[in-house]
Every structure is written in C-alpha cells, then in structure tokens.
C-alpha cells in the first residue's frame, strides 16, 4: 500500500517537473516571439515610412517634371472645335498666342525691371494694353526700364555696392561651398504699401513651385559697417553774375583777380547760407564765360555747398511732394510748422530738400548781384529718363576690351542710354541772305508728314519754347554751353538759298529735304530774277498762312475808276524815288515754332504760292524778292499789305535806308502824276484777294484798306480725338497726348513783369514752378514727357501750363492728372507755403480743350490756332504790336513820329494804323 502511494507520489512529482520544464521554454519562446514581433513591426514601419518618404519626393519631382504650364483660358496644343470654321480657328489660335506672349512679356518685365510680383489689376492692365497692340513687346520693356521705380532701384544698387551678409553664414571649411549672400530687399512700391521681401529664384523655376522655403528674418541680418550715406552732403550749383564781365584772368585760379572775386562771393554766399540747418562751408569751384547776343561776355560762377549729415537714410517730409507712388499724399502725417521745419537737422534732408533750401535762401536775399533766373543745380536726384545717363555717368563703368585693344589701353566707358541726335549748340545760325525761284520751292517744302523729319531736336531737361524768348537770349555761348535754353530747334526754311556770305551769328543753314518731296508741287518753269534778300529774325508770333491769288487784268479798269477821286498827299521827296520797304510775313513751317521770316517785296508780278496744306500748287512761278530790313533794326513782328508805288507805308520797324534798295528804286519810272492809277495797277498785279468789300462810307473818308484773305484749306486738318477708357488713354498714331491745365496761387501778388517773358521775375517764377511740378509729375504719371509753362495771368497768379505724354498711357489721363494736381496742391500748402486753390484747377485734354483759353490773350490781340498742330499763340490785332513779350500796344503810341509831314496816326478797327494828312487825304498805309 505504501509502495503504491510512493509510486503515485513519484509519478506526480515527475509530472510536475515535466510540466515546469515545458512552461519555461514556452515563456521564453513567447518573449522572444514578442520581441521578434516588435522588431519586425518596427522594421516594417521603418520600411513603410522610408518607402512613403521616397514616394513623396518622387511624386513632387514627377509633378514638377510633368507640371502643366500656366494657361488660364486655353489649354496648350493645337485645339480645334468641330463647329468652328478655318478662319475662326486661325483667329482663336492667334488670339491665344497673343495672350500667352503678352502674359509672359509683362510677367518678365515686372520680374526683370521691378523685381517684384505685380498686382492683379496692374498686371491685367498691361496684358490688356499689350493685346490691343497699344505697346509692342519691346515698348513694354522700354517703358518699364524708363520707369521711375526701375531707375530708383538702379540708383540704390549702384550707390550701395556692398551687400549685407547673413549672420548664420555657412563656413566654407565645413561645407566646401560658396558663401551665401543675402540679397537686399528693395521696396519699390508706394510709401503707404508694404511689400514682403522676395528672394531671387533659380532660372527655370516658377515662383509658385517653391515649397516651404525658409527665409532669414530681417532681425538676423548683420549690420553693415560701411555707412549708407556719406558724412557730408554736397550741393553744387551755378549762377550768372550780373555786373561782372568775364576776363581771361578768371580762368586761372592762381591769378589775383580770380582770388579776389572768389573770396568776395564766397564771403557773401557764406553769410546767406549760415542760417541753413547743417551748413558747414561753401567753395567757389570756378568761373565760366557766357557770351551774350550783343557780343559782350558775362561770368558764370560755380559753387559747392557742404552740409553735415549722418549715415542713415531718413525719409524727409518733402518726399510727399517729390515721390508719391500711388498719386496720394500721406495725409496721416502731422504737418510741420515753419519753425519746426527750420529746426530739422540737415541729417534728415535729402539732396532735393537741400537744393530747395539753397534756392529759397538765394531768392530771399536780393542783395547779391546774380541772375537768379540762371540758377542751375547739378546732379539732381530726379531727372527725366532721357537724362538719366548724366546721373549714373562715372559711377557705372564697363571695361572696354577686345582683340584689337591691349590690356594697357583698355578703357572704362560710362554706362549710358542711347540718346537722340543732338545739334551742336555752339551758336545759333540763321541765313542772312537768300535767293530762290519757284522751282526750288518743291525741293524745300514737303507735306505735313515730312516736317517731322526736318527738325533735329535735343530732349530738354526742362522743356522751354525758345520762340517766345527775345532774340538776345537765343544765342548759347561758344565755349561753355549753358543750360538757359535747353531745347534747340533747327527750323526748316521753305524758301532759302544763299547768294552771299552770311554772318555766323545771324544765319542758319536748314537741313536739306528729300528731293522726292517735289511731287507735292506743280509748277510751270520760267526764268526767275534773283535778288539778294537778308532775313530778319523777329520776336516771333504765330500767323496763319496767307493765300495770294493773281487777279484778272480785266478788273484793272474798274479799280482805277473806284480810286480816281483819291489824290496824292505830300510826302518826303526822297520817298518818291525809292520804295518804302514793306514786310510780308511768311510762315515757313506748319508747326508754330515762332521762327518767322520778314522779307520785303519791291516789285513782283504775282506771288503764287499757298502754304498751309499738304499739296502745294504754283501757277505763276515768277517771283522777285527785294532787300529787307537789317536784323538789328527790326524790333517788331510785321505783316503788311502789298506795296504801293510812290507812297509811304506805315511799317512796324524803323525807316529803311535808301542804300538797301538801289535796284528797286531804279527799276521803276517816275510816274508821280498817275500815282493813284499805279496803286490800282499794283493792286491788280499783286492779286490780293480781299475777304471784305469796302463800305460805302469809306469811299469819302480818306482811308483805303486792303485785306488779305484767310488761308484756303486744300486738305482738311485731321480731327484730334483721344480714345479714353477707365484704364487707358490713346492718341492717334504719330501723335502725343497733350493736357492743358491751370491753377491759381492765392498768396502771390501779380505784377506787370509777369507779362514779360524776358523779365527776371518771370524767369524766377517759371523756374520755381518747373522745379516743383516737374519731379512731382514724373514720379506720379507713367508716360509723362514734357511740361511747359505757357504764361502767368492776373487773378492772384494764374499759372497756365501744358503737359505732353506718350501716345498711350495706362490710365484715364484726365482723372489721373486731376488727382495728382489735387495732391500737389495739398502738399504744397503743407510744406511749401504755397496756397493753391484746388477748386480752381482746370484740366482739359487737347482733344476737348480750347488752346486759346489757356493762352489768355488780351483785348488788343487775338488767338490764332494752327489747325494741323493744334498749337495756339497770341497775335496782335492790326495796328498793334508787342515788344519783348509785353502786351500788345498801339503803333501810334510806340512810334510817335510814325507819320511824316504833320500827318496824324490813327487806328482803324480791323484795318490797322493809317496816317491821315492835314488836308484829309492820305495814301494807303495799312499795317497789320
């Protein structure tokens, strides 16, 4: 029994041992399995993650590789719709091509020239303008390259050559790569807009393909050890000394006269500029010679003023006037009082501000013997795009190297923009004497389309109109060309050929015209008598072309019968044997340049030419011109009727010496007894077609009046019409956009000197408005080209002006100009002490404006407008004349001794000035 119990117990123990031994490996295997499972799971996760990561990168690469191009409207490739005709398919393909090209051109223009992404509206406006063929692709590039924003970017990057570097710059020893330079962000938008910093993208990569690009914050950028601006700011200017004649000693800085004059003016200038903030010192750079018209020479002094400043570039308050990006003034700024503006340190002023301070100080102190109208600054920060080469000249250089140049000879040339053909302005040349036949007329005159090619002009920095200046101001000096009149125009003379040597200072040689223009003139060739005729240059007033038509000889008897009751009065004995010079004013160009030529006619059978249309006709080509008045004796512009034998004609110029007309005096027989009949014969011969018949009351009044006709228009002048929308304004092909405007300054008093264009007050006020308005308009109006101050009129001071733009601008020109000028009025009132009445702004585009309205002619003059050029000017009424730009005055007042032998000068309305003898009889003496 015990044995059985022991065996059972032993069996149980063995069973327990076997069971325990089995459980231990099971647990071990289970743990290992669990560990293996965990390991395999992690490997699987790692492999899955890796595979997922690789797939994402590959997927991004594949997407970039096979990414479709941007196409907002059409898909790429040749797509054909079944319902379209072949013509429609071609048109749609061309339209799509134009769209894609314009999109890429505009996009690249913004990226290359402005280095920024365009706004949706401006991008769409440019694309639309390109699609309408308003601009070609290269014109878009030129427009962007000449924009103020692009020029400012270039100026800043040329000025600051050193780029800032990152603090977290990667070492070349660790990476073996190149140093990474942070490209400076340039804000080219309006002042009120904040643009994010854009970094350059590698070529071939689109901006919207960059994902998760990290940028270095602005705070991490290292501080540039080189100051952004110099410690001193220099302002250089030149001005003409009024009572100082130039001598050879002034060209030598070591001469006693040079030192004495320099010390004198340096001390005077220093007293004026001491009150300016930040003023340090002033230096006299030198003296230049300026030759006047009368042969005398004046002295131009060049100064340089130094102002102290720090190295930080701070935006000044004057930026509200000179740089307004979006045609708006930041009205949030609190306007500064005059006292606070005085306390502003020069360290916070830009070059423009300092120039304004210098100009203001010189205008306030009138003690200096200088001509403030000739004040000129150099290196101005804001200039027209055509003059930008002067601003960067000497700073950007291109090494000139090539196979033909040695390394030792290689030079550096300044980077300049291509400029138009310029004319040597060393002296004004005017043809003194000329002789012509009608057959030569065809080679000299072309149609209206040809006149543009007969002018060679240089682009002005400040547009002027030289034709309105007196003759003595029109001659630049020969050695140092001054900038008093920066626009030089060589007029195309229609009837000019030289027959004797001309004086260099009084003659000009026009450019030859193409002989193909002879098709515009139909002539009957016949021999022409050639008589030397000196040209007379006047103070220029615009006149309409005159049509002289030969009359039938059958009317001679009728004219004699009408005039038989008029007897001959008493005149000087010398006048019976010689002809008084009579001036006939001819317009030798269709455009109103004011370059009028006065010639006198002695005897001619007919004057058969018409100027003023595209086709010129001549039927009686026998023309003879006789001698005219010397240039130095002609003071007034003159237009008179055809000559009369044995009579005195009231001329608007001094008496003609008998020596000037020997041929004319000897050519006519003495027929004193038939003087009245000769008048009728000459009237028939001259063929003057009158527009008005003499009233019956005039037959017994002792006045005989002759009128020339208005020009006969052969070809109707083209109508001027601008295409204006909310987003663009376009002129006709070959035309410019012109806008007239006037504004009224209420805190200025008008003086009579502002009528005279040659007065110092007029020039000073004109220059002041040019310096204020020109930079403001350039920086705010795209396509702006030229500003011209037309005149000043009474009413406080009313400034009438004219602006010229490119043929197309991407905005409504009337609304844009009105907005810009309103902002200018507000800014001028806050910072320039100019009270401009914004409600008085009158802005009219040329296609809607009346140019005569802005000329503001007085009661003794009338406005004449050229129908082709739409240019207007004031012309004195018959019997009145203007001298030195002053308002028109009566000839009887200007020349008290106009009539001889006790005759009385009277003005006949609409007829002119006549001399009435004491016995109530008079010869015709009509002038206009």
Curated annotation (Swiss-Prot):
SUPFAM superfamilies: SEA domain. Residues 26-50, 164-191, 441-481, 494-522 are annotated as: Disordered. Keywords: Cell projection, Extracellular matrix, Glycoprotein, Heparin-binding, Hyaluronic acid, Receptor, Repeat, Secreted, Sialic acid, Signal. Changing residue 793 to S: Reduces binding of hyaluronan and heparin. A motif (Heparin- and hyaluronan-binding) lies at residues 785-793. Abundantly expressed in the retina (at protein level). Localizes to the photoreceptor layer of the interphotoreceptor matrix of the retina (at protein level). PROSITE patterns: SEA (PS50024). Disulfide bonds: none annotated. GO terms for molecular function: chondroitin sulfate binding; heparin binding; hyaluronic acid binding. Highly glycosylated (N- and O-linked carbohydrates and sialic acid). The keyword Metal-binding does not apply. GO terms for cellular component: extracellular region; interphotoreceptor matrix; photoreceptor inner segment; photoreceptor outer segment. This is Interphotoreceptor matrix proteoglycan 1. It comes from Gallus gallus (Chicken).
